């Protein structure tokens, strides 16, 4: 069978697709199916990714439901946990750096200064990452 990292990534993507379609119940179902509610501490990104993705999806669900502070708290917690991990080379694990997601969230909420801070922070760990660079370009206009 698939490992926890792959399962969590799949449910995360399913949850995001559901949110983008406005289907909150499917997004919540993906979050529930993902599991990973329990706190985990490891230096291994693939061990930590399910927890990070759970916090990220839960935060995005809260944001879609209009609970801005809870969304920032959950995604901020994911960013802190990811920030405690050693830097790695290669594709992002999980699929989106949590600092970038936090920047996207601040941008969506109209907080340009915090968005810029987290895009820049994301680029310190993922040099040249296109989505973070695009976020900074969007802020410049």
Can you say where each PLM-predicted feature lies in the sequence?
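"A position-specific structural signal for the A-helix of alpha-solenoid helical repeats
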Residues: 9, 13, 50-53, 57, ...
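Residue signature of alpha-solenoid helical repeat architecture, marking inter-repeat boundaries
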Residues: 3-6, 45, 49-51, 89, ...
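Amphipathic alpha-helical segments of tetratricopeptide repeats
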Residues: 32-40, 76-87, 121-124
């Amino acid at each position: 069978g698939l490992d926890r990292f792959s399962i969590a990534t799949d449910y995360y993507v399913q949850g995001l697709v559901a949110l983008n379609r406005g289907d909150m119940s499917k997004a919540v179902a993906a979050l529930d199916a993902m599991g990973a509610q329990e706190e985990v501490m490891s230096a291994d990104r693939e061990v930590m990714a399910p927890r990070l993705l759970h916090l990220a999806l839960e935060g995005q669900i809260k944001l879609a439901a209009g609970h801005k502070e809870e969304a920032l708290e959950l995604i901020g917690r994911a960013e802190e946990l990811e920030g405690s991990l050693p830097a790695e080379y290669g594709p992002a694990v999980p699929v989106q750096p949590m600092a970038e997601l936090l920047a996207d969230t601040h941008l969506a909420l109209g907080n340009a200064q915090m968005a810029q801070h987290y895009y820049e922070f994301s680029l310190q760990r993922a040099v040249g990452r296109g989505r973070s660079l695009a976020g900074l370009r969007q802020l410049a206009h």
